[in-house]
């Protein structure tokens, strides 16, 4: 009985943890359109969820939808999408598209995790199962690597843009820096909001160097 309770508790906590990660990536999508980070994190986490939870991992997308919906209700207009000058219907469509992209990434990871579990069952050695899991986790990153190449791209892009803003913009105090991924330009950009209300835009060029727009 005690072992069963512990197993249920562990399963529930893992579902909540993986769902929370999915919700955080959704938040990053609607706040900064951060597609690269989502493609980097969500598939790998979903592979791990399937390996640890098995069939119960399919509760993760469901809980993610619930958490994302709750966030959207509480956040209201406090996201990048709501700042767009467009109709409420268009905003709703974009929010749905963000959630749909997240779900696709989750199910790709879950599918790869399921394949890893099937192959792992044919091998009783734990080391072999771990290796298979790692291989499929790496495979889940193939679309991201084909598009963005650098595994640390989201982190390095944010760091370079913020550092460049601090070093080069000195004529006015900086009130805020918002880094986002431009879907139209396919690169990270930064809106630097000055204390006088002016906004200056920075971006990363093809070589990964920060520049002013």
Question: Whereabouts are the PLM-identified features?
Answer:
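Membrane-water interface at the C-terminal end of transmembrane alpha helices
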Residues: 5-11, 100-128, 147
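Canonical alpha-helical transmembrane segments
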Residues: 25, 40-64
